[in-house]
Swiss-Prot record:
Positions contributing to substrate binding: R227, D357
Organism per entry: Pseudomonas fluorescens (strain ATCC BAA-477 / NRRL B-23932 / Pf-5)
Biological-process GO terms, alphabetical: homoserine metabolic process; methionine biosynthetic process
Active site residues of this protein: S157 (nucleophile), D323, H356
Functional summary from the UniProt entry: Transfers a succinyl group from succinyl-CoA to L-homoserine, forming succinyl-L-homoserine.
Origin: domain of life: Bacteria
Protein name: Homoserine O-succinyltransferase
Amino acid sequence: MPTAFPPDSVGLVTPQIAHFSEPLALACGRALPAYDLIYETYGQLNASASNAVLICHALSGHHHAAGYHSVDDRKPGWWDSCIGPGKPIDTNRFFVVSLNNLGGCNGSTGPSSLNPDTGKPFGADFPVLTVEDWVHSQARLADRLGISQWAAVIGGSLGGMQALQWTITYPDRVRHCLAIASAPKLSAQNIAFNEVARQAILTDPEFHGGSFQEQGVIPKRGLMLARMVGHITYLSDDSMGEKFGRGLKSEKLNYDFHSVEFQVESYLRYQGEEFSGRFDANTYLLMTKALDYFDPAANCDDDLAKTFAHATAKFCVMSFTTDWRFSPARSRELVDALMAARKDVCYLEIDAPQGHDAFLIPIPRYLQAFSHYMNRITL
Protein backbone atom coordinates (compact mmCIF):
# COMPACT_ATOMS: atom_id res chain seq x y z
CA MET A 1 0.00 0.00 0.00
CA PRO A 2 1.55 3.30 -1.06
CA THR A 3 2.26 5.96 1.53
CA ALA A 4 3.84 8.20 -1.12
CA PHE A 5 2.66 8.32 -4.70
CA PRO A 6 4.86 8.07 -7.80
CA PRO A 7 6.03 11.46 -9.12
CA ASP A 8 4.05 10.96 -12.33
CA SER A 9 0.80 10.27 -10.45
CA VAL A 10 -2.00 12.80 -10.07
CA GLY A 11 -2.02 11.69 -6.42
CA LEU A 12 -5.12 11.79 -4.25
CA VAL A 13 -8.33 12.65 -6.06
CA THR A 14 -11.83 13.30 -4.77
CA PRO A 15 -14.87 12.46 -6.90
CA GLN A 16 -17.45 15.20 -7.38
CA ILE A 17 -21.15 14.93 -8.16
CA ALA A 18 -23.04 17.24 -10.49
CA HIS A 19 -26.82 17.25 -10.11
CA PHE A 20 -28.99 18.16 -13.08
CA SER A 21 -32.65 19.04 -12.57
CA GLU A 22 -33.49 19.82 -16.20
CA PRO A 23 -35.14 16.79 -17.86
CA LEU A 24 -32.96 14.87 -20.31
CA ALA A 25 -34.88 13.60 -23.35
CA LEU A 26 -33.63 10.18 -24.44
CA ALA A 27 -33.53 8.39 -27.78
CA CYS A 28 -35.91 5.71 -26.48
CA GLY A 29 -38.68 8.31 -26.18
CA ARG A 30 -38.53 8.61 -22.41
CA ALA A 31 -36.89 11.31 -20.29
CA LEU A 32 -35.03 11.49 -17.02
CA PRO A 33 -36.48 14.38 -15.00
CA ALA A 34 -33.29 14.70 -12.94
CA TYR A 35 -30.00 12.87 -12.60
CA ASP A 36 -26.51 12.91 -11.10
CA LEU A 37 -23.16 12.48 -12.83
CA ILE A 38 -20.11 11.57 -10.76
CA TYR A 39 -16.78 12.72 -12.14
CA GLU A 40 -13.14 13.41 -11.34
CA THR A 41 -10.79 16.07 -12.65
CA TYR A 42 -7.02 16.09 -12.94
CA GLY A 43 -4.84 19.11 -13.69
CA GLN A 44 -5.93 22.75 -13.86
CA LEU A 45 -8.33 24.43 -16.27
CA ASN A 46 -6.55 27.37 -17.90
CA ALA A 47 -7.96 30.89 -18.06
CA SER A 48 -9.39 30.42 -21.56
CA ALA A 49 -10.74 26.92 -20.79
CA SER A 50 -8.93 25.71 -23.91
CA ASN A 51 -7.05 22.80 -22.33
CA ALA A 52 -9.95 20.55 -21.29
CA VAL A 53 -9.89 16.85 -22.20
CA LEU A 54 -12.82 14.46 -21.77
CA ILE A 55 -12.17 10.78 -21.02
CA CYS A 56 -14.98 8.41 -22.05
CA HIS A 57 -14.98 4.98 -20.44
CA ALA A 58 -15.64 1.54 -21.87
CA LEU A 59 -18.32 -0.99 -20.89
CA SER A 60 -17.27 -1.72 -17.31
CA GLY A 61 -15.34 1.50 -16.73
CA HIS A 62 -16.11 4.44 -14.45
CA HIS A 63 -15.01 7.91 -13.43
CA HIS A 64 -11.89 6.86 -11.51
CA ALA A 65 -9.41 6.93 -14.38
CA ALA A 66 -6.26 8.12 -12.56
CA GLY A 67 -4.73 8.65 -9.16
CA TYR A 68 -5.87 7.29 -5.81
CA HIS A 69 -8.85 7.80 -3.55
CA SER A 70 -6.88 6.87 -0.44
CA VAL A 71 -3.30 6.24 0.63
CA ASP A 72 -4.48 2.69 1.29
CA ASP A 73 -5.53 2.05 -2.33
CA ARG A 74 -3.60 -0.84 -3.80
CA LYS A 75 -4.26 0.22 -7.38
CA PRO A 76 -4.70 3.59 -9.10
CA GLY A 77 -7.45 4.49 -11.58
CA TRP A 78 -8.06 2.31 -14.63
CA TRP A 79 -6.07 4.51 -17.09
CA ASP A 80 -3.40 5.77 -14.74
CA SER A 81 -0.68 4.70 -17.18
CA CYS A 82 -1.93 7.35 -19.62
CA ILE A 83 -3.04 10.22 -17.35
CA GLY A 84 -0.67 12.25 -15.19
CA PRO A 85 2.36 14.54 -15.25
CA GLY A 86 4.52 13.69 -18.26
CA LYS A 87 2.19 10.91 -19.39
CA PRO A 88 0.39 10.88 -22.76
CA ILE A 89 -2.51 12.88 -21.32
CA ASP A 90 -0.20 15.25 -19.49
CA THR A 91 -1.87 16.92 -16.52
CA ASN A 92 0.81 19.61 -16.57
CA ARG A 93 -0.83 20.74 -19.83
CA PHE A 94 -4.38 19.45 -19.77
CA PHE A 95 -7.40 19.69 -17.50
CA VAL A 96 -8.84 16.19 -17.62
CA VAL A 97 -12.46 15.26 -16.89
CA SER A 98 -13.49 11.64 -16.39
CA LEU A 99 -17.04 10.64 -15.52
CA ASN A 100 -19.17 7.60 -14.85
CA ASN A 101 -21.79 7.51 -17.57
CA LEU A 102 -25.48 7.84 -16.96
CA GLY A 103 -26.84 4.37 -16.24
CA GLY A 104 -23.62 3.36 -14.52
CA CYS A 105 -23.25 1.84 -11.08
CA ASN A 106 -20.42 3.86 -9.57
CA GLY A 107 -22.19 7.03 -8.46
CA SER A 108 -24.02 8.38 -11.50
CA THR A 109 -27.77 7.88 -11.70
CA GLY A 110 -28.47 4.36 -12.91
CA PRO A 111 -30.62 1.27 -12.35
CA SER A 112 -29.37 0.83 -8.78
CA SER A 113 -30.35 4.42 -7.88
CA LEU A 114 -33.60 5.14 -6.07
CA ASN A 115 -36.50 6.10 -8.31
CA PRO A 116 -37.95 9.24 -6.65
CA ASP A 117 -41.43 8.26 -7.84
CA THR A 118 -41.42 4.90 -6.07
CA GLY A 119 -38.73 5.12 -3.39
CA LYS A 120 -37.33 1.86 -4.75
CA PRO A 121 -34.35 1.18 -7.04
CA PHE A 122 -35.11 1.83 -10.72
CA GLY A 123 -33.99 -1.70 -11.63
CA ALA A 124 -35.26 -2.77 -15.04
CA ASP A 125 -37.47 0.34 -15.19
CA PHE A 126 -34.44 2.51 -15.86
CA PRO A 127 -34.67 3.71 -19.48
CA VAL A 128 -32.54 2.14 -22.18
CA LEU A 129 -29.72 4.50 -23.18
CA THR A 130 -27.70 5.18 -26.31
CA VAL A 131 -24.23 6.59 -26.91
CA GLU A 132 -25.84 9.82 -28.10
CA ASP A 133 -27.77 10.09 -24.81
CA TRP A 134 -24.46 9.87 -22.97
CA VAL A 135 -22.94 12.56 -25.14
CA HIS A 136 -25.87 14.90 -24.45
CA SER A 137 -25.43 14.36 -20.71
CA GLN A 138 -21.68 14.89 -21.01
CA ALA A 139 -22.29 18.16 -22.85
CA ARG A 140 -24.36 19.38 -19.91
CA LEU A 141 -21.49 18.52 -17.59
CA ALA A 142 -19.13 20.48 -19.85
CA ASP A 143 -21.47 23.48 -19.64
CA ARG A 144 -21.53 23.17 -15.85
CA LEU A 145 -17.72 23.20 -15.77
CA GLY A 146 -17.48 26.22 -18.08
CA ILE A 147 -16.05 24.24 -20.99
CA SER A 148 -17.43 25.35 -24.36
CA GLN A 149 -15.03 23.22 -26.40
CA TRP A 150 -12.89 20.18 -25.61
CA ALA A 151 -9.27 20.23 -26.67
CA ALA A 152 -9.76 16.48 -27.09
CA VAL A 153 -12.33 13.79 -26.44
CA ILE A 154 -10.63 10.44 -25.91
CA GLY A 155 -11.88 6.92 -25.40
CA GLY A 156 -11.09 3.27 -25.92
CA SER A 157 -13.58 0.65 -27.11
CA LEU A 158 -17.08 1.90 -26.21
CA GLY A 159 -15.35 5.09 -25.07
CA GLY A 160 -14.06 5.60 -28.60
CA MET A 161 -17.62 5.40 -29.90
CA GLN A 162 -18.56 8.23 -27.55
CA ALA A 163 -15.62 10.29 -28.79
CA LEU A 164 -16.78 9.76 -32.38
CA GLN A 165 -20.36 10.66 -31.47
CA TRP A 166 -19.17 13.94 -29.97
CA THR A 167 -17.77 15.03 -33.35
CA ILE A 168 -21.14 14.28 -34.97
CA THR A 169 -23.55 15.65 -32.36
CA TYR A 170 -21.47 18.65 -31.24
CA PRO A 171 -19.05 19.22 -34.15
CA ASP A 172 -17.94 22.67 -32.97
CA ARG A 173 -17.19 21.54 -29.43
CA VAL A 174 -14.33 19.11 -30.17
CA ARG A 175 -10.92 20.02 -31.58
CA HIS A 176 -9.39 16.53 -31.47
CA CYS A 177 -10.99 13.09 -31.34
CA LEU A 178 -8.98 10.02 -30.33
CA ALA A 179 -10.80 6.74 -30.96
CA ILE A 180 -8.74 3.82 -29.65
CA ALA A 181 -9.52 0.13 -30.25
CA SER A 182 -12.98 1.12 -31.39
CA ALA A 183 -15.33 0.74 -34.37
CA PRO A 184 -18.01 2.69 -36.27
CA LYS A 185 -20.56 0.01 -35.29
CA LEU A 186 -20.63 -3.53 -33.92
CA SER A 187 -20.37 -6.54 -36.17
CA ALA A 188 -22.99 -9.29 -36.02
CA GLN A 189 -20.51 -11.42 -34.07
CA ASN A 190 -20.05 -8.70 -31.45
CA ILE A 191 -23.80 -8.29 -31.06
CA ALA A 192 -24.01 -12.07 -30.63
CA PHE A 193 -21.43 -12.03 -27.82
CA ASN A 194 -23.43 -9.32 -26.06
CA GLU A 195 -26.65 -11.29 -26.42
CA VAL A 196 -25.10 -14.40 -24.87
CA ALA A 197 -23.92 -12.26 -21.95
CA ARG A 198 -27.36 -10.71 -21.52
CA GLN A 199 -29.10 -14.07 -21.60
CA ALA A 200 -26.77 -15.33 -18.88
CA ILE A 201 -28.04 -12.50 -16.68
CA LEU A 202 -31.69 -12.53 -17.74
CA THR A 203 -32.08 -16.27 -17.14
CA ASP A 204 -30.44 -16.24 -13.72
CA PRO A 205 -33.22 -17.05 -11.20
CA GLU A 206 -31.83 -14.35 -8.91
CA PHE A 207 -32.39 -11.63 -11.54
CA HIS A 208 -36.08 -11.34 -10.64
CA GLY A 209 -36.94 -9.36 -13.76
CA GLY A 210 -34.37 -6.75 -12.80
CA SER A 211 -35.77 -6.20 -9.29
CA PHE A 212 -33.12 -8.26 -7.51
CA GLN A 213 -32.17 -5.41 -5.16
CA GLU A 214 -35.65 -5.44 -3.68
CA GLN A 215 -35.21 -9.17 -3.06
CA GLY A 216 -31.85 -8.63 -1.35
CA VAL A 217 -29.95 -10.77 -3.86
CA ILE A 218 -27.80 -10.37 -6.97
CA PRO A 219 -27.76 -12.53 -10.13
CA LYS A 220 -24.20 -13.56 -9.35
CA ARG A 221 -24.13 -16.61 -11.58
CA GLY A 222 -25.39 -14.69 -14.59
CA LEU A 223 -22.96 -11.82 -14.06
CA MET A 224 -20.08 -14.27 -13.69
CA LEU A 225 -20.92 -15.99 -16.95
CA ALA A 226 -21.41 -12.67 -18.76
CA ARG A 227 -18.01 -11.46 -17.60
CA MET A 228 -16.31 -14.74 -18.47
CA VAL A 229 -17.66 -14.60 -22.03
CA GLY A 230 -16.70 -10.96 -22.36
CA HIS A 231 -13.24 -11.44 -20.95
CA ILE A 232 -12.41 -14.13 -23.50
CA THR A 233 -13.10 -11.60 -26.26
CA TYR A 234 -10.85 -8.98 -24.65
CA LEU A 235 -7.77 -11.23 -24.87
CA SER A 236 -5.97 -12.65 -27.89
CA ASP A 237 -5.37 -16.33 -28.49
CA ASP A 238 -1.62 -15.70 -28.31
CA SER A 239 -1.81 -13.86 -24.99
CA MET A 240 -3.99 -16.57 -23.44
CA GLY A 241 -1.65 -19.24 -24.75
CA GLU A 242 1.40 -17.47 -23.38
CA LYS A 243 -0.19 -16.76 -20.01
CA PHE A 244 -1.94 -20.08 -19.42
CA GLY A 245 -1.32 -22.56 -22.22
CA ARG A 246 -2.79 -25.88 -21.15
CA GLY A 247 -1.34 -25.54 -17.68
CA LEU A 248 -3.11 -27.40 -14.89
CA LYS A 249 -3.93 -26.19 -11.39
CA SER A 250 -2.64 -29.47 -9.97
CA GLU A 251 -0.47 -32.29 -11.25
CA LYS A 252 -3.27 -34.51 -12.53
CA LEU A 253 -6.75 -34.44 -14.04
CA ASN A 254 -9.78 -35.10 -11.83
CA TYR A 255 -12.05 -36.52 -14.54
CA ASP A 256 -15.15 -34.62 -13.43
CA PHE A 257 -17.18 -31.58 -14.46
CA HIS A 258 -16.93 -29.52 -11.29
CA SER A 259 -13.23 -29.17 -10.50
CA VAL A 260 -11.18 -26.22 -11.73
CA GLU A 261 -8.49 -28.15 -13.58
CA PHE A 262 -6.91 -25.76 -16.09
CA GLN A 263 -5.28 -22.48 -15.13
CA VAL A 264 -7.35 -20.61 -17.69
CA GLU A 265 -10.53 -21.92 -16.02
CA SER A 266 -9.32 -20.60 -12.68
CA TYR A 267 -8.54 -17.21 -14.22
CA LEU A 268 -11.95 -16.85 -15.85
CA ARG A 269 -13.78 -17.88 -12.70
CA TYR A 270 -11.78 -15.38 -10.67
CA GLN A 271 -12.58 -12.60 -13.14
CA GLY A 272 -16.26 -13.50 -13.07
CA GLU A 273 -16.37 -13.74 -9.28
CA GLU A 274 -14.65 -10.40 -8.79
CA PHE A 275 -16.84 -8.66 -11.36
CA SER A 276 -20.10 -10.00 -9.95
CA GLY A 277 -19.29 -8.42 -6.60
CA ARG A 278 -18.81 -4.90 -7.93
CA PHE A 279 -20.99 -4.41 -11.01
CA ASP A 280 -24.74 -4.02 -11.38
CA ALA A 281 -26.49 -6.51 -13.65
CA ASN A 282 -28.98 -3.97 -15.02
CA THR A 283 -26.12 -1.61 -15.85
CA TYR A 284 -24.41 -4.43 -17.73
CA LEU A 285 -27.55 -4.93 -19.81
CA LEU A 286 -27.76 -1.19 -20.54
CA MET A 287 -24.12 -0.89 -21.55
CA THR A 288 -24.25 -3.82 -23.96
CA LYS A 289 -27.41 -2.46 -25.59
CA ALA A 290 -25.77 0.95 -26.05
CA LEU A 291 -22.93 -0.85 -27.81
CA ASP A 292 -25.35 -2.75 -30.04
CA TYR A 293 -27.35 0.35 -30.96
CA PHE A 294 -24.36 2.51 -31.90
CA ASP A 295 -24.54 3.00 -35.67
CA PRO A 296 -24.37 6.71 -36.53
CA ALA A 297 -24.23 6.04 -40.27
CA ALA A 298 -27.74 4.57 -40.09
CA ASN A 299 -29.02 8.16 -40.05
CA CYS A 300 -27.03 8.99 -43.19
CA ASP A 301 -28.09 6.25 -45.61
CA ASP A 302 -25.37 4.01 -44.14
CA ASP A 303 -22.79 6.37 -45.63
CA LEU A 304 -20.11 6.67 -42.95
CA ALA A 305 -18.30 9.47 -44.77
CA LYS A 306 -21.51 11.52 -44.90
CA THR A 307 -21.94 10.92 -41.16
CA PHE A 308 -18.83 12.99 -40.45
CA ALA A 309 -19.57 15.69 -43.03
CA HIS A 310 -19.98 18.43 -40.41
CA ALA A 311 -17.21 17.30 -38.05
CA THR A 312 -14.50 19.91 -37.52
CA ALA A 313 -12.22 17.87 -35.27
CA LYS A 314 -8.89 16.34 -36.17
CA PHE A 315 -8.91 12.59 -35.68
CA CYS A 316 -6.44 10.06 -34.33
CA VAL A 317 -7.49 6.43 -34.73
CA MET A 318 -5.50 3.67 -33.03
CA SER A 319 -5.84 -0.10 -33.23
CA PHE A 320 -3.93 -3.16 -32.04
CA THR A 321 -2.85 -6.01 -34.26
CA THR A 322 -4.26 -8.87 -32.18
CA ASP A 323 -7.54 -7.18 -31.22
CA TRP A 324 -10.23 -9.42 -32.71
CA ARG A 325 -13.13 -7.80 -30.84
CA PHE A 326 -12.54 -4.47 -32.62
CA SER A 327 -10.01 -5.45 -35.25
CA PRO A 328 -7.67 -3.10 -37.12
CA ALA A 329 -9.89 -3.63 -40.17
CA ARG A 330 -12.72 -1.84 -38.33
CA SER A 331 -10.43 1.09 -37.53
CA ARG A 332 -9.27 1.26 -41.14
CA GLU A 333 -12.93 1.32 -42.20
CA LEU A 334 -13.35 4.39 -40.03
CA VAL A 335 -10.18 6.01 -41.36
CA ASP A 336 -11.25 5.42 -44.97
CA ALA A 337 -14.58 7.13 -44.27
CA LEU A 338 -12.88 10.09 -42.60
CA MET A 339 -10.52 10.50 -45.53
CA ALA A 340 -13.46 10.29 -47.94
CA ALA A 341 -15.06 13.07 -45.91
CA ARG A 342 -11.80 15.05 -46.28
CA LYS A 343 -11.10 15.13 -42.57
CA ASP A 344 -7.69 15.48 -40.94
CA VAL A 345 -6.95 11.95 -39.68
CA CYS A 346 -3.93 9.93 -38.62
CA TYR A 347 -3.93 6.18 -38.08
CA LEU A 348 -1.71 4.13 -35.79
CA GLU A 349 -1.73 0.34 -35.77
CA ILE A 350 0.20 -0.90 -32.76
CA ASP A 351 1.83 -4.33 -32.81
CA ALA A 352 0.74 -5.81 -29.48
CA PRO A 353 -0.06 -9.38 -28.40
CA GLN A 354 -2.59 -8.49 -25.68
CA GLY A 355 -5.74 -8.27 -27.82
CA HIS A 356 -8.52 -5.75 -27.20
CA ASP A 357 -7.35 -4.96 -23.66
CA ALA A 358 -4.08 -3.61 -25.07
CA PHE A 359 -5.48 -0.07 -24.92
CA LEU A 360 -5.41 -0.33 -21.11
CA ILE A 361 -1.83 -1.62 -20.94
CA PRO A 362 1.33 0.57 -20.81
CA ILE A 363 2.90 -0.75 -24.02
CA PRO A 364 5.94 1.47 -24.74
CA ARG A 365 5.26 2.06 -28.45
CA TYR A 366 1.60 2.79 -27.74
CA LEU A 367 2.44 5.30 -25.01
CA GLN A 368 5.07 6.93 -27.22
CA ALA A 369 2.68 7.32 -30.16
CA PHE A 370 -0.11 8.52 -27.86
CA SER A 371 2.20 11.14 -26.30
CA HIS A 372 3.43 12.29 -29.70
CA TYR A 373 -0.10 13.04 -30.85
CA MET A 374 -1.18 14.75 -27.64
CA ASN A 375 1.93 16.95 -27.64
CA ARG A 376 0.86 18.33 -31.02
CA ILE A 377 -2.38 19.72 -29.63
CA THR A 378 -2.18 23.49 -29.31
CA LEU A 379 -3.90 25.14 -26.37
